[in-house]
Amino acid sequence: MSRTRIAVGVCVATIATASLASVSNAASTKFTAAMSGAQEVPTKGDAKTTGKATITVTGKKLCYTIVVRNLSGVPQAGHIHSGMKGKAGPVFVTLFGKPKAPKKSKLSGCVSATASQIKAISAKPSAYYVNVHTKEYPNGALRGQLKKS
């Protein structure tokens, strides 16, 4: 009986170690989006604002860096929306929802995403876009479609 317990213990330890190793060695997938106010629909965003979003997915963690130029106003929220180019769509993943520092040009952080969200974005990144909202542009100051990089 004690040999059985030892064998079971060794198996459990081996499986746990392998599971932890696979989580820590999870491959990352990177997506980018060239952003501008002109891409916002149905109303245009901030005409002079441009930017670039980089989204890195590792497991269920989604990390973002959004660099914006000439943004008028304080970033209030950032999202990934579902929607093809030229179409507005609902929020799919909230990146941030609290105001950032005034005129902050680099927005970054990490959020959790569900397996189904990650799978959907990975399957067809062009069906999703990143946008940043300000008080002046509550529907979005700038936007860019995702693409795998």
Show which residues each predicted segment covers.
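Metal-centered catalytic cores of metalloenzymes
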Residues: S2-G78, S82-S149
